[in-house]
């Protein structure tokens, strides 16, 4: 937690050009982050040990079912590493966690794996569960430091209808059951 600056916002704001990176996906392909087929990309930051990400995963996956919407995850450093899922010491460690997320935990979205140094994550502000909506021109049209699926969905529906975004992101904690399961899987820290 000491690595996060909760007082200062970093990363692209609404109206800014979204940073683009060529990254390896959990399936081993190299893809460009902003090369998506639809009108909008919902990009969520996440890791297997982040209770906020884990609690919102199913709802966020369903957003990709909306016509005109692509959805992806930027796999970042572990939010709450423990004895079982440790801080990444190599890119292979990080790739292993991202692969586990897709194969064992069922994440269906494209999972981009950031480098060990977190260059893409830093460019997007370094928050563990931020979300960005990016349009086809590569412009950020919505951002939230903490993902709230209801606000994200409302923003998407506004954008798809050609309206100004009225959704206001706000922090919503994960359910205790998800917190205990996620941290239990990570192991004692």
Model-derived regions, located:
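Short, solvent-exposed loop/turn segments at secondary-structure junctions
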Residues: 48-50, 78-79, 118, 147-148
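Thiol/disulfide oxidoreductase modules built on the thioredoxin-like
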Residues: 105-107, 113-155
């Amino acid at each position: 937690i000491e690595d996060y600056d909760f007082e200062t916002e970093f990363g692209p704001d609404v109206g800014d050009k979204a940073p683009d990176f060529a990254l390896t996906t959990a399936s081993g392909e190299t893809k460009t982050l902003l090369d998506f087929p639809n009108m909008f990309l919902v990009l969520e930051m996440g890791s297997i040990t982040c209770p906020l990400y884990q609690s919102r995963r199913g709802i966020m996956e369903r957003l990709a079912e909306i016509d005109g919407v692509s959805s992806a995850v930027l796999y970042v450093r572990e939010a709450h590493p423990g004895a079982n899922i440790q801080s990444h010491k190599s890119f292979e460690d990080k790739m292993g966690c991202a692969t586990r997320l897709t194969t064992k935990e069922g994440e269906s979205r494209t999972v981009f794996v950031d480098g060990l140094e977190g260059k893409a994550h830093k460019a997007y502000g370094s928050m563990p569960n931020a979300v960005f909506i990016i349009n086809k021109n590569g412009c950020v049209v919505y951002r939230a430091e903490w993902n709230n699926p209801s606000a994200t969905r409302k923003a998407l529906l506004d954008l798809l209808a050609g309206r100004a975004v009225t959704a206001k992101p706000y922090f919503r904690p994960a359910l205790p059951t998800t917190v205990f399961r996620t941290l239990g899987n990570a192991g004692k820290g």
